[in-house]
């Protein structure tokens, strides 16, 4: 299992949250996607952290990033980016 973590700084937090909820199924319907969770900053309410569990980095890259679902996802949420998101993949230590 791989955890994708993406940090979004946005211009309109409420509009971004609504756009995310409308586009969330683009992620969930991807082969290899196990779970999706979006959190919103308390101290920085225009910052969001997305956590997606994937079977592998390849599942993320091949089954989502390289598809029309990714294009639809970015079309929905991209207009609210204050800057490009920061995205990394992580694995468990234990």
Give, region by region, the residue ranges found by the protein language model.
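Short, surface-exposed ligand-recognition loops at beta-strand->loop->(often short) alpha-helix junctions
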Residues: 9-19
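An amphipathic, aromatic/His-enriched active-site/gating alpha helix that lines ligand/cofactor pockets
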Residues: 18-33, 53-86
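Generic structural motif
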Residues: 11-13, 57, 92
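Glycine-rich beta-strand-turn "strand-cap" elements at beta-sheet edges
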Residues: 2, 37-49, 72-94
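Short, well-ordered beta-strand segments in beta-rich or mixed alpha/beta enzyme
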Residues: 2-9, 37-65
């Amino acid at each position: 299992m791989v955890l994708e973590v993406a940090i979004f700084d946005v211009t309109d937090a409420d509009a971004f949250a609504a756009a995310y909820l409308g586009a969330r199924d683009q992620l969930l319907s991807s082969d290899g996607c196990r779970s999706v969770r979006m959190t919103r900053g308390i101290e920085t309410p225009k910052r969001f952290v997305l956590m997606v569990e994937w079977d592998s980095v390849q599942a993320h890259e091949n089954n989502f990033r390289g598809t029309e679902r990714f294009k639809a996802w970015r079309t929905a949420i991209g207009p609210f980016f204050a800057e490009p998101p920061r995205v990394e993949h992580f694995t468990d230590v234990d």
